[in-house]
């Protein structure tokens, strides 16, 4: 099929930059064909934001009457997020929670003071919290939505990947940075100090399960590399099941009573996050490192490879993906890092309209060192 008319109708500017229209057509054609991943190495200045938004609108028109097409665009920097908002006024943006001042002067959503305020009945996020309300519109109603990479990775699948909230397409801008972000945010950190707000709502016996899980690693040293064995998987599964049960009980409690609803909602969010992180750790099939351990107090586990955590971080939450960057620097290596099967991918390397002699590359004479 020829999608040229759709592209012309939805492109936001009078003229296309060199290679821009071809990139849009390539993405749309392969999305319609069912490719799960579209890898696009696009030169700086081509206009990636217009490519992303035009692809969304063309796909929405193609799918009209068949499905409610939703696109999530994720960026690694606040500056790039602002650029998207400047270029397209119809995008609905969710920023980091620190960007939403609290009307109760209790810090950002999910902070210790916020949880204390909610626990005391001083706030109901659904009616009083700008971040919470914006997040709900973003995930449930916005069909062209924008957020930061951190939120997309850290948000549990039940929050942004269920039937009500799931995006049809996720556009990963500056995708050359996504592997580091995935490893960073996939780290499993259990700190008993952080469980105080959960304990007030869920009880001491419940939070004691976390300390017991920490102690399952007492025989290992910090810096130890390992693959979760059957015993660790069993321990993690028991904790996940306990978390799921408690979250279900709290959701029912929230429905039955308006008092304390805010604190319960915050705790449910935390519990969902724990369950997602634990599942990613125990059942990803990859190697992990014990970064930090303190008996019955703290445990930090970090994945060794990106591909072992990418499903929980990204792929389980959406159906199709566009990976865009000016510096992918090798499609095969990127696919290996990101756990992408060649049969599921289409790639395009758009030519740079700027002559090579005007694009010098400078090598920085620097290395990383530790003190």
Spans of features found by a protein language model:
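Conserved pre-motif I regulatory segment
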Residues: 1-41
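A substrate-engagement module of RecA-like helicase motors
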Residues: 2-10, 15, 44, 60-145, ...
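Walker A/P-loop
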Residues: 33-55
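Conserved helicase ATPase motor motifs in RecA-like P-loop NTPase domains
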Residues: 41-45, 195-213, 318-333
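A contiguous, basic/glycine-rich beta-loop/short-helix subdomain that forms a polymer-engagement track
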Residues: 125-140, 155-162, 250-368
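Conserved Walker B
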Residues: 142, 149-150, 174-178, 182
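Conserved phosphoryl-transfer catalytic core
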Residues: 176, 180-237, 241-244
